């Protein structure tokens, strides 16, 4: 299926260079001087087996009304509205600027899907800038070098995933179908019934993280035996190993997984298969433990793994290993919490457990924390409480009007758990912007105490009984 992609971003981040790279010709003028591109330019692009229309746009700038820059911005905004997908480009070497933040907010409010890419990452440059890009709230940034053609494989994967989603005739219908499937899977779900854990079914937990952070050592400590091979060499564990275990009379299915590296470092065929096996373990788990090494800096790959867990709808717990080797634990913990809040805004309040897998200190806190996250993941909120909350939320902050008409939210209901999923009903559901949906999700998380779990929120259109009468009259 053909689709249209608009490359957007502030001036001089490499939009025209990427445009030329994708169309295979130097159709767009490229120079180091900001603002070279003034008019939108379209071309037919090919990437692997994908064919699509690409739009090169003028650099987004803050500008006074009536100026040339303001007219250029209007043209860019029209391109965004015309596109099926936006590719927001930032300069990783320069880091995230106030303009980047400003325009990411604009794009979050737009109904057009967005892929975030960090350009000028050749030779490992711009690592700090890529980390900063997480605070834009647009997911994991793709590292690119438009000039050298690096990172196009990651871009292809993202575009191919988007193209699959376009196979539905209508994007809104696709959301409705997905919600209907989830409702069918949860037939008989009653949000007003208290959650009662199924103690007969095993609690499924996957332990994942970068290589050599101590995953197998932690599993051995929990089991009380040297079940898993461990050592200082990174990558000893090759498969996702499932282990049946019992904790305080409750059955647990525990997965020790292969270390996940960033894709550029995954070269051996066996290691690629190991990573795929780890991804399957994440999808089968109910709670995912991301294990960090307290002695190493927080890396982009950790954020990428957390983003994957959120997308898969699993409960999340951050565990920091080798805590006995930290000189200033309170300061390190404070910085870690701030980094998580800033870089993972989509999962606020993720619980953190600190421990030493080698000595066993702090490991007694792990399973109770996993059980709490599992309870949050299964949370049920009574419909009456939900609607009282929504009335208060709307009274504090009304949805923005659309086309000069107010957007009224009728009611809200929880349609499933695992993870908590809610439907908000409105006669103008399509006009509720992404920013307002995010406001509702944050409110749900804070009010009903749902840390460490993804929250799904769908807008559903209510039928207007007078609409048919107007058509007949």
From Swiss-Prot:
CDD domains to which the protein is assigned, alphabetical: EngA1, EngA2
Keyword line: GTP-binding, Nucleotide-binding, Repeat, Ribosome biogenesis
InterPro entries: G_ENGA, GTP-bd, GTPase_Der, KH_dom-like, KH_dom-like_a/b, P-loop_NTPase, Small_GTP-bd
Domain KH-like: from-to ranges: 379-463
Binding site for GTP 1: 9-16, 56-60, 119-122
Top-level division of the source organism's lineage: Bacteria
Residue spans crossing the bilayer: none
Molecular function GO labels: GTP binding
Residue span, EngA-type G domain: 3-167, 203-378
One Gene Ontology term from the biological process aspect of the record: ribosome biogenesis
Binding positions for GTP 2 per the UniProt entry: 209-216, 256-260, 321-324
Pfam families, per database record: KH_dom-like, MMR_HSR1
Nucleotide-binding among keywords: yes
Function: GTPase that plays an essential role in the late steps of ribosome biogenesis.
Subunit structure: Associates with the 50S ribosomal subunit.
Entry's family note: Belongs to the TRAFAC class TrmE-Era-EngA-EngB-Septin-like GTPase superfamily. EngA (Der) GTPase family.
PANTHER family on file: GTPASE DER
Full protein name: GTPase Der
UniProt source species: Parvibaculum lavamentivorans (strain DS-1 / DSM 13023 / NCIMB 13966)
